[in-house]
């Protein structure tokens, strides 16, 4: 029963996430979904006509229709500019070195990088965000909690020669904030 509930919840979240990016997602895009997790977001993208490559540091999918490439979390096993779009959907704060994962996403993307991240605006919200993330992911030990503020994420994007073309704040459970970022490569 709990497993069915989690799958249903993941399916609903995947549909919601697709809606956040659909305006900037050309049809039939070649996409890499980095940190695919349950696989439901990759599945929604595939069902909408995109060519999706799913990668993660371990296979945590809850669907037989998605099989991620398991990689070391440091270097993606793809050439430069292999994908139209790299997607990092609520994954960077799970990484011990989010800057490296982000740079790899930019390296393998021809043009766009989509990011959805939990952000905080003060110390209380930082710790509440950490607690809620641990609870939602059932990860209470070994979670790096490398969340950043909006300004810190946006500084990382600039340092990597990316232009912010769309930003939208989304409230979660009324008090938490996620930010949608659509980024494009620019010449350094």
Regions found by a protein language model. Give the residues of each.
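Class I SAM-dependent transferase core
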Residues: 1-7
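Conserved alpha-helix/loop element of class I SAM-dependent methyltransferases that forms part
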Residues: 10-28
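C-terminal alpha-helical "lid/dimerization" subdomain adjacent to the S-adenosyl-L-methionine
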Residues: 21, 43, 116-160, 165-173
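Class I SAM-dependent methyltransferase SAM/SAH-binding core
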Residues: 32, 38-75
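A conserved beta-strand element that flanks and buttresses the S-adenosyl-L-methionine
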Residues: 87
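Hydrophobic adenine-recognition pocket in adenosine-nucleotide-binding enzymes
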Residues: 91
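A short glycine-rich, Lys/Arg-flanked "PGG" loop and its adjoining helix->strand segment in the class I
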Residues: 99-113
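Core SAM-dependent methyltransferase catalytic element
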Residues: 169-188
